[in-house]
Swiss-Prot record:
The name this protein goes by in its record: Probable nicotinate-nucleotide adenylyltransferase
GO terms for MF: ATP binding; nicotinate-nucleotide adenylyltransferase activity
Keywords, ordered alphabetically: ATP-binding, NAD, Nucleotide-binding, Nucleotidyltransferase, Pyridine nucleotide biosynthesis, Transferase
Pfam families (alphabetical): CTP_transf_like
GO biological process: NAD biosynthetic process
EC number of this enzyme: 2.7.7.18
Reactions accelerated catalytically: nicotinate beta-D-ribonucleotide + ATP + H(+) = deamido-NAD(+) + diphosphate
Gene that encodes the chain: nadD
Organism of derivation: Clostridium beijerinckii (strain ATCC 51743 / NCIMB 8052)
Length: 204
C-alpha cells in the first residue's frame, strides 16, 4: 500500500520548520510521498492579506527541490475561490487512486485545528478520506490537545495521529517581520526561498 501525506498551509513564506515537519512525518509514518499544498483562499482566513499565489508556489518548489520524496501541487491555487479541505482530499484521493489503487492518505496540519474543526465543512467526509496527523504548536496545552483529539475522534468517527516533534521557534509571521525590519532570515529559510523574497521585494 502506498502512503501519501498532504501538508497544507499558506506558506507565506515556507520555512525550515515546515520542511522538518514534513520530513519527520514521512519518517515516522513511512510515507512514500509528501505533497505540499499552498492554500488558495481559506474560509476561516478569507480576510487575510497574503502574497501572490504564484510566488508562494515558487517558494515551496524552490524549498523542496533537493527532497525527492517531496512534491508541490497547485491544485488549490489553480482551482480559485474558497478552498475546503474535504474537496482537496477528494481530488487527491481520486487522482492518486487512478495511479495507485491501494493507497492511504494522511492530512498533516497544526494541532490548533482541533480547536476549530467543528467550524469546518464536511468533517466526517474528511475522516472518510484521510487520517488526520497533527503536530503541536506553541501555546497549546498538551492535555487540552489530547482531550480535543479524543472528542473529535469520537464525534466524527475519525482517526487522529499526534506527532511528537521538537518545536522549532520559526514562524512565517516572524520571517515577514524580519524582512520588513531589514534583519537576516537565512537562518530560517532555504537560500533559494530567501532569493525569491529579496528579488521580488516581498514583505517590505
Amino acid at each position: 500500500m502506498k502512503r501519501f501525506g498532504i501538508i497544507g498551509g499558506t506558506f507565506d513564506p515556507i520555512h525550515n520548520a515546515h520542511l522538518y515537519i514534513a520530513y519527520e512525518a514521512k519518517e515516522k509514518l513511512s510515507l512514500d510521498e509528501v505533497i505540499f499544498m499552498p492554500a488558495g483562499i481559506q474560509p476561516l482566513k478569507a480576510n487575510n492579506i497574503i502574497t501572490d499565489p504564484g510566488l508562494r508556489y515558487s517558494m515551496v518548489k524552490a524549498a523542496i527541490e533537493h527532497f525527492s520524496e517531496f512534491s508541490v501541487s497547485d491544485y488549490e491555487i489553480e482551482k480559485g475561490g474558497l478552498s475546503f479541505t474535504h474537496e482537496t482530499l477528494e481530488y487527491f484521493k481520486n487522482k492518486i487512486s487512478d495511479r495507485d489503487k491501494d493507497n492511504e492518505l494522511f492530512f498533516i496540519t497544526g494541532a490548533d485545528c482541533l480547536f476549530s474543526m467543528e467550524k469546518w465543512k464536511e468533517v466526517k467526509k474528511i475522516f472518510s478520506l484521510a487520517t488526520l496527523v497533527v503536530f503541536s504548536r506553541g501555546g497549546i496545552n498538551k492535555s487540552d490537545m489530547i482531550n480535543r483529539k479524543h472528542m473529535i475522534e469520537e464525534k466524527y468517527n475519525g482517526k487522529i495521529i499526534v506527532l511528537d516533534l521538537k518545536e522549532l521557534e520559526i514562524s512565517s509571521t516572524d520571517i515577514r517581520n524580519r524582512v520588513h525590519e531589514n534583519k537576516r532570515i537565512d537562518f530560517f529559510v532555504p537560500e533559494r526561498v530567501s532569493d525569491i523574497i529579496y528579488k521580488n521585494r516581498l514583505y517590505r
